[in-house]
A protein has these predicted regions:
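Generic beta-sheet signal
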Residues: 93-95, 172, 255-266
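Short alpha-helix plus adjacent loop in nuclease-associated cores
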Residues: 208-218
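C-terminal transmembrane module of eukaryotic multi-pass membrane proteins
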Residues: 253, 257, 265-267, 273-275, ...
Length: 303
């Protein structure tokens, strides 16, 4: 299920407006993709995350120039994606994948420790001081982390000493998990970079965090407590990406047909599932991280 939402960008002098979500779909089955795709990460990669010599754990959430390797320009990435799509043999897209900034649940886990969080506190809605379920908000640090990504976008796009080829291409479509923390992160990440009109976000249920017993991953107090295995999460993400990569059919608005650059705002569990699905180097992204990838999609029946 999905719903469209527009987040207009305010004048630069204004503080970010309070988050006011529009219509949001409830939990339920998403439309099946017209074609199931198999996904791989383009190798060799343009980005430092796939470099074996890179200590990804030591990287900041926002890597300068979003982790583009030295000696490579964004124009090189765009040109290669365009060339590969023209040659055929698959559908290629540059995908900026972002983890939401710190949420109240992340703060609570840090407060109590992972073991106590998983065993006890994650199954509650709060502790009398913090409220993290269902659907927790960003903390002030989480808001700042999203704004740090926004600052990097502005720095790269408006550097007077940069050539057009050195500037990162903006996503042509924005996708988000239905959770408030992901939506608010995307809003703050891209605020103002598209000009005064802003950019529409498309909410996809399939980008939500791992379904389990944690109250922070429930859509509402009535959300069913079901447990999703690692394999089921990967399968769910594959189906969602297949909808995004499929040609427009008129029946599924998730298609990014014609867009060679897209962005996804989601969660740590979803990003790790994406790494498993595509063969990307596996790591745990920090809150507020933005990781670019070039993905190739081919019909699953041909692999």
């Amino acid at each position: 299920m999905q719903a469209a939402m527009t987040a207009p960008a305010p004048a630069p002098a204004q503080a970010p407006a309070a988050f006011a979500p529009g219509p949001s779909p409830g939990p339920g089955p998403a439309p099946a993709p017209a074609q199931l795709y198999a996904f791989t990460t383009l190798q060799p990669s343009f980005f430092i995350y796939d470099n074996p010599s890179t200590d990804v754990a030591a990287l900041p959430a926002v890597v300068p120039n979003f982790g583009l390797k030295e000696g490579v320009e964004w124009g090189d990435v765009v040109q290669e994606v365009r060339r590969l799509n023209e040659v055929g043999g698959g559908v290629y897209k540059l995908v900026y994948v972002g983890r939401h900034g710190q949420g109240v649940h992340n703060l609570a886990e840090a407060k109590y420790g992972t073991e106590a969080w998983d065993d006890d506190w994650s199954h509650r809605n709060g502790d009398g001081e913090l409220v993290w379920g269902p659907d927790p908000l960003l903390t002030s640090l989480g808001e700042q982390q999203a704004e740090d990504v926004n600052e990097e976008w502005r720095l790269r796009l408006h550097n007077p000493n940069s050539t057009p080829s050195q500037k990162p291409p903006l996503p042509q479509r924005l996708y988000s998990s239905p959770f408030t923390r992901a939506l608010e992160t995307a809003k703050r990440t891209y605020m103002g970079v598209y000009g005064s009109e802003g950019k529409e976000q498309l909410i996809l249920e399939g980008l939500r965090e791992t379904i389990g017993g944690h109250t922070c991953d429930m859509r509402s107090p009535k959300s069913p407590i079901a447990r999703e295995s690692e394999e089921e999460l990967v399968e769910r993400l594959q189906e969602t990406l297949s909808r995004i990569f499929s040609p427009a059919t008129g029946t599924d608005v998730a298609s990014s047909d014609g867009a060679q650059v897209i962005a996804i705002s989601c969660h740590s569990g979803v990003m790790q599932a994406l790494f498993r699905l595509t063969g990307h180097r596996f790591f745990t992204p920090k809150t507020g991280a933005l990781v670019p990838m070039v993905l190739k999609a081919v019909p699953a029946t041909s692999t």
